[in-house]
Amino acid sequence: MLPVPLIQLQCGVNSYEWGKKGNSSRAAQFAAASLDDNEFKIDEEKPYAELWMGTHPSNPSKDKHTGRTLLELIQDNQALLSPAIAERYQNKLPFLFKVLSIQKALSIQAHPNKKLAEKLHARDPKNYPDDNHKPEMAIAISDFEGLCGFRPLKEIAHFLDNVPALRQLVGEDKAKAFVETVKRNDGNESDEATAENKKVLQSAFGALMASSEADMTAAADKLVQSAKSAGADFTGTAVPSPGGAKLSELVGRLHGQFGADYGLFVLFFLNFVEMKAGEAIYLRADDIHAYISGDIIECMASSDNVVRAGFTPKFKDVDNLVNMLTYDFAPIEQQKMEPTDYTQDVKNKREAGATLNQTAIDSQSEIVEYNPPIEEFSVVRSLLKSQGSKVTFKPIDGPSIIICTQGQGKISVGPKVQEIKKGHVFFVGATAECVLESEDDKFETFKAFCVLDEQSNGN
């Protein structure tokens, strides 16, 4: 008889310099709960950036009780993934689940699509360790700031007209061509106008990124002085989001973190986003972004490929970044994800994936799904709001990883019942019914899972 497919995991934490220090880092807090005292103690002077949950070889999760890696367990028993997923994803978990704790901005970056990833990996495996694409989703668990996708073009045109240092670095000819094209195509949504707009966007952005280090440094000094002296009037009147005062503060803060950097100017090309806990954004492969501050749950296709171009001491690949981007532009609202009630049917998509007991219903507990337009992963957030509240996840034909982010309770699969509290992480095998029961007034978990599109139950 096979063991019950409920496995408590030990998960490693990465200490990148952009992470929050010591116990202020959720990634560190959760790692401390996941690992034994003799294996991990939080150092208050050390930054802790990412907790990794999954089978990726850079930081693989392990069975807490046997020490074997989750990858070994999956490869020994394909039923944990389901035969269809094991075949589709070469006996590996299709997704990588993370907690990020961000004190200092991450690099201006994008993740290559599948075709480009294969090419970059073959050419430069040191800097591009995977041949897979990396679409990703970020769900805030504290106040979050980030840069995501290109702004509406009228906003960029406003900045080129009102931020002399930006116009100087892009160059007068490119800036003028951009502003004139955007004005001429205003309100024109034809394919031809969109293609023309994307072309001038790539031209202006490419010119910025191709400018010399000396020119960028001189322009950065001018930009920082202007931001400091102008305050709320920075960038002129009728300022696009997030407003002159906030943009001035951001320029000062990011300059304090990185000094003169191309990222200070990329700021004016990208949407600035603020999220409260529970809000989410989805980033496709080839979408440009940078996280600035906060704590997030992040889920992505299993890859560690990053093409960077600013706010980083690491390897930069500006040419590839400029050439790979889609140059789609849209308000940030179009990148935010609206979760759906996971206890209800979604027409033509899936049946209800979970049920609540009466105690959970009475306390207005929430079970919602964030379901991006790819099949490698979805994420369900469960917030049980009273002791005795219970959610039962229906069996799905795919694997799940569950992390508790606040409170405590019990997790059970079949006859196996275990304690789960803040920082605990569990793997649940395919086709298993899983029950969470709260022993707290606020018991929150996030569950990442994969089912293939042909199956309607759960995705």
Swiss-Prot record:
Involved in the synthesis of the GDP-mannose and dolichol-phosphate-mannose required for a number of critical mannosyl transfer reactions. Zn(2+) binds at Q109, H111, E136, H289. Binds 1 zinc ion per subunit. Its main location: cytoplasm. Keywords: Cytoplasm, Isomerase, Metal-binding, Zinc. Its cofactor is Zn(2+). GO terms for cellular component: cytosol. It holds the Pfam family PMI_typeI_cat. This is Mannose-6-phosphate isomerase. The keyword Cytoplasm applies. It comes from Neurospora crassa (strain ATCC 24698 / 74-OR23-1A / CBS 708.71 / DSM 1257 / FGSC 987). It catalyses: D-mannose 6-phosphate = D-fructose 6-phosphate. CDD domains: cupin_PMI_type_I_N (cd07011). GO terms for molecular function: mannose-6-phosphate isomerase activity; zinc ion binding. Its EC number is 5.3.1.8. GO terms for biological process: carbohydrate metabolic process; cell wall mannoprotein biosynthetic process; GDP-mannose biosynthetic process; protein glycosylation. Belongs to the mannose-6-phosphate isomerase type 1 family. It is found in: Cytoplasm. Pathway: Nucleotide-sugar biosynthesis; GDP-alpha-D-mannose biosynthesis; alpha-D-mannose 1-phosphate from D-fructose 6-phosphate: step 1/2. The active site is at R308. NCBIfam families: manA (TIGR00218). SUPFAM superfamilies: RmlC-like cupins (SSF51182).
